Structure formats: structure tokens, C-alpha cells
Swiss-Prot record:
Pfam families, alphabetized: OTCace, OTCace_N
EC number(s) reported in the record: 2.1.3.3
Organism: Erwinia tasmaniensis (strain DSM 17950 / CFBP 7177 / CIP 109463 / NCPPB 4357 / Et1/99)
Descriptive protein name: Ornithine carbamoyltransferase
Location of the protein in the cell: Cytoplasm
Keyword Cytoplasm: yes
InterPro entries, A to Z: Asp/Orn_carbamoyltranf_P-bd (IPR006132), Asp/Orn_carbamoylTrfase (IPR006130), Asp/Orn_carbamoylTrfase_sf (IPR036901), Asp_carbamoyltransf_Asp/Orn-bd (IPR006131), Orn/put_carbamltrans (IPR002292), OTCase_ArgI (IPR024904)
Gene encoding the protein: argI
GO biological process: arginine biosynthetic process via ornithine; citrulline biosynthetic process; L-arginine biosynthetic process
Binding site for L-ornithine: 168, 232, 236-237
Catalytic activity: carbamoyl phosphate + L-ornithine = L-citrulline + phosphate + H(+)
Amino acid sequence: MSQLYQRHFLRLLDFIPDEINGLLKLASRLKATKKKGDETQYLKGKNIALIFEKDSTRTRCSFEVAAFDQGANVTWLGPSGSQIGHKESIKDTARVLGRMYHAIQYRGHGQQLVESLAEHAGVPVWNGLTNEFHPTQLLADLLTMQEHLPEKTLNQMTLAYVGDTQNNMGNTLLEAAALVGLDLRLVAPKSCWPDPALVAQCRDVAQQTGGKITLTEDIAAGVQGADFIYTDVWVSMGEPKEVWHERITLLRPYQVNMALLQATGNPQVKFLHCLPAFHDDQTLLGQQMAQQYDLHGGMEVTDEVFESAHSVVFDQAENRLHTIKAVMVATLSQQE
């Protein structure tokens, strides 16, 4: 993976298919060595800044544990721990941190912010999530798919993403499908489809890799024959309550339940979710949603599906660690 040394990791379309497949192989190898307890530390003495303008569980833990496993040191800068965009520009922050750290992770708002960090830092910058893209999540998703369907290569797999497909997950799934040749179906109301320009761009790339990208409102047609069903939350914290009502009303027919899994015609279909999920009423927000919108069986996914043998969401969550570690090792060391 020496070709990725000192590279940024901002969005998947910055890479070619061989580079993405190389990262997945590296992640699988790093996972195996960690499980055996004989992991080689490639990042001893490296210092890494973790900027979180949005709260996180999986992303923060994955970056921190990956760094510690590899012998690196981290500094966590939370929403109140830096002056980015308030008293200091992103450009100036990048130039300061680039003098002190070997790499910078950014999880926050607009993609232009992480792009600006990368432009000015002089060290590798990794996108932990922006409003537009979530590339580290997709690496974990692809590794999970390979592990749970080893008899197929990625370009032989079919994935249906059901629900709100115009978010950062929908965008990044498009890019992933184009690069690795997935048969991707985005199953959603037309008003929840992604930006047509991005769809066109990804379809152009998919022509070279054998990928197929379909957008449809037809749930039965969209999930037929799928190897994986994927969904994400319908609403986000901070959105107005009026938006919640509109979104839930619009997307209720697209809930992932057992009937939808059965509609795939594939008894071995697996369920993916990037988490957190509103699958029950065991959280304060889940209770509020259940009472207000009569969603006692779950929102975007039912508890029955989430807790079933179809669900591989916790393997998926664990793989955040191994794939993020692969990005760190590939961009900060020259080992093959």
C-alpha cells in the first residue's frame, strides 16, 4: 500500500478500485493479527489529531483504539476544544496542526471543511464523516460484506439501500458501488434520491468496473435478489420536529421489517446499518418517537430484524476499527 503513503482519505472517488481493494486486504490482515495477538506496530511515535465537531461513538473509539494498537498518540479536539471556524479559520488551524501532528482526522459538517484542511495541513487528512460523505464507514461495510458472503466477490454482490438515500451514506454507497462494481439499488421515494450529478458521475465510473446503479421507488423490485439490505436513520438530531413528521410519514412504507427481507427471495439475506439505530424504545429519543409516531416496533428497522440472525450490524461496527486502522497504516507508513 505504499502508493497511499502521505495521501489524504476524503472521499472514495479519490481512489482507484485497486487501492480500495488493497485497503480491504490490509484491514483483513490487520484484523487477523490483532485477533492472534501478534500485531506489528507501524505507527510508533506518530502523533494524530482527532477533530470532532460532531459527537461520535464508533468513529472516535475506532480511531483511538487503532492508534493505540499501532503505537501512535492521539489528541482529541471536541466541539468545545478547538477554535475552528470561530476564532481561527480552517486554513490557519490546518497549518498549525500540520506542524505538530503527522495526520489529522476530521468529523464535522461540510465536505469543503475537510477539503480545506487537506489543502493546507501538509499532512494526511482523513474524513471521519461530513454532511456529504462517510468513506471510513463504507470500508467497514465492504469488509463486512466480504466476510459474510465469501463465495462471491464484491462485483458479484447486490445491495439494496432502503429509506433516505440522499444523505452521506447514500452518496458514499454510490461511490463505493461504482468503484468495486456492486449492483446497488437505492430504494426510496423520489424526493429522497441523491444528487443527479453524483449519480451520473458514479454511473460513468461503474461502466468501467461492471457496477450497476438503480434508483427506484418500487420496494419489491428494488430488494428482489439482494444479498444485503442496508438502511440508516430517517431523522437526525438538530433537525426541526416538523421535518421529523414529514420524513417519518414519507418513509414509513420503507421500514426494514421481516416482510421486506422475505421480499428479497433470499433466505440468507443480511442486514446492515451504520448505527445508531432506532429499532426499539430503549433510549429517550426512541421512546419519544414511539409515543409520538406509533413506532413501537422500531423506526427505520424493526427490533425483530435488528436482533435476528440476518443482522450483522455489530460485525460491521467492529470492522470500523480494522478498516480505519488500515487507512492510518497505509497513509502513515510505507509497508506493503
